[in-house]
Amino acid sequence: MKLKQVLASALLLATLLTLPARAAQASGAKGEANITPDTPMAKIRSNPSVMGAGLYTYNQEQDNPRDIRKWKDTTLREYVNDCTAEDCAKGLNRMIENYNSGIQITYKLYTDEEIAAVPTRQKAEIYYFPGSDPGGKFVLVIGGNAIHTSAEMREGVSTAEWLNELGYTCFVLRYRIGDQAADNAPLEDVSRAVRYITEHAEQFHVQPEDYAVLAYSSGGQIAGLFASDSDTLGHKAYGVSKPGALLLGYPVN
């Protein structure tokens, strides 16, 4: 019974967090691409295009509802860190411009039936950052996590911006962490992301083969396992192709 209550609460929280995005999408409202490192998080999250794009701008349990002032008043620089704030702001503005031009940003990785079977799959999604080289290779970016704190913006968006400037198309992965990472859930999410992107390569204007994975910290550990030739944990276990390039930033080992 307790497990069911926990899962029900998780589903309710996920639903509440997506309500603003659905409202923005329904209204067709568009926000300005005017984010700077010193923009408060509350202003970023209330930007109609950020909401409509569907990017996850929280850090899991770091945004406890009992500490509302923290995530409202904190600037982007304070929220991510000084090293990545500039690129993160540029990446958010690029995302806003893409969304305003009609590009879909967020893609769910599992079907409604699959999510109903395993509710935590609701959180798994990718964020699309198209590059300037149509038909080029793509990069899957996997941020780290501190068990209960994710890094979609700090490491994901900032890295996507850097790679976009080089012409590469990027996908930032949001995967299951913490107590939702049981039964190799993160590996399942990585493999599903690769499968989804390669199956929709024409739609995304990317090559389906020889893709790259760039991952940080514990995300690097996950990526390393996925890229291995392990029959139980590697890409072969999930029936997807091996990355053509693997770049790991301070991976956990």
Regions found by a protein language model. Name each.
Residues 9-18:
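Bacterial N-terminal signal peptides
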Residues 19-26:
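Sec-dependent signal peptide cleavage junction
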Residues 59-61, 65-134, 183:
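N-terminal cap/lid segment of alpha/beta-hydrolase-fold proteins
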Residues 136-145:
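Short beta-strand element of the alpha/beta-hydrolase
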Residues 145, 169, 174-178, 252:
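Short beta-to-alpha linker loops that shape the active-site pocket of alpha/beta-hydrolase fold enzymes
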Residues 151-155, 173-208:
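Catalytic nucleophile-loop/oxyanion-hole region of alpha/beta-hydrolase
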Residues 153-171:
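Short amphipathic alpha-helix adjacent to the substrate-entry channel of hydrolases
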Residues 192-253:
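Primarily recognizes the serine-hydrolase "nucleophile elbow" in alpha/beta-hydrolase
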